Amino acid sequence: MPGSVPPPSPTAVDDPAPSPVAVSGPAHLLRLTLLMAGSCLPVLGAVLIAPVLPRMQDHFASTPGAKALVPLALTVPALSLALLAPFAGVIVDRLGRKRLLIVATVLYAMFGTAPLWLDSLGAIIGSRALVGVAEAAIMTCCTTLIGDYYSGRQRVKYLALQAVCTSASATAFFVVGGAVGAAGWRAPFWIYAVSLLIAPLMAAALPNPAARAATQEAPAVAVARRPFPWRPMAGICALTFFGAMVFYTVPVEMAYLLDDLGVENPGVIGLATAIASAATVAGALVFARLKRSPDVALPAVFAICGAGFGVMFLAGSVPLLVVGAVVNCLGTGMLLPALLTSAMSRLAFEDRGRGTGLWTSAFFGGAFVCPLVLLALESAVGGLAGAVGLLGAAAAVVAAGLWGALRRAGAAHPRPLPKPLA
């Protein structure tokens, strides 16, 4: 798998040209705020209703299969997102990023608030699947627009900021969902309406990158259109699928690992998870300051993640488990923007929507199967800690393979990322 991820060619589209839009001033801040807010909407869909699932379970107790169906209300948007993001990417390239983003943001509010008026559990799950459709378009469009608006070091910086915002918002939305859920299990669904405030601002403040690209690239019309980079994107997407499992292991399994050590206090579990989440944010901030190619960073990042899993596997006490989780999450904080930046460096403007959709599908597909894979590993080795240790060993193998691939490709001493020119 690692050998299928070659370094960018000398003609990679991630050239040192200045960012095509202003990178300072009020317009820039508003544009960046909207893109970050849009990127957080799929996270909201993933965690907002988690605290009220027990209340939903009680409400639909008389519905056949409710014990299995109610959790689907939480997870089915991620599955829809993973399945449909590639199609969203194709639509992005054909219809335009901004137009699809605005439509999807409005539909997000419509589908997200639907459970306020639906009484059937099946209908609610159906509306949640449609939320995932809107999320696929929103995430693909926001990430693609970051790639369109910014280049070089600015692009790296803002993709890392996207990872920071989505990681921090997950914790915030979980707290908000729990607080609002005190008013009833339907109450958190009102929060989906916030996207109706964002959509008109996006329409007014986000420039249309298609028009800009058409004027800037007009002199190159005579040049033959290069084919879509299927082979390098396949390698990046395979890495991303595995990386998503690495990324989500601590958030999904930390409470169970603590329980295995005899910790049942929700406050202690919440504090330990919050500390690990803070390390994820710190890792993304560290990545934003790196001055080397993301391809060179990936072996070290996977090695850090694997080392953290190794400590967690060996941990016989809560403090050591938390240390391992912090090490792992420091690595995963760098992993997400490293993978995304590496993918972006291989995509021309006309391919960026499709490529971003494929990457998004790979990431959320890995997130969806993460607990299933760990469950299978746990059954095989007889314990969750052992399953985490196996995943850490796999991360170490991937790190070694990537390092070897870079050496074979002569990329051990790559060019540094371009400095900001605006």
Please give the residue ranges for each predicted region.
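Extracellular/periplasmic helix-loop-helix junction of adjacent transmembrane segments
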Residues: 52-83
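Conserved MFS/SLC helix-loop-helix module at the cytosolic interface between two early adjacent transmembrane helices
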Residues: 82-122
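Helix-to-loop junctions at the C-terminal end of transmembrane segments
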Residues: 83-96, 282-295, 378
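Paired small-residue
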Residues: 107, 111-114, 122-131, 319-327
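Cytoplasmic helix-loop-helix junction between adjacent transmembrane helices
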Residues: 121, 127-167
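Helix-loop-helix hairpin linking two adjacent transmembrane segments in secondary transporters
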Residues: 152-154, 161-211
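C-terminal transmembrane helical hairpin of 12-TM major facilitator-type secondary transporters
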Residues: 294-339
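A late C-terminal transmembrane helix in Major Facilitator Superfamily
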Residues: 344-382
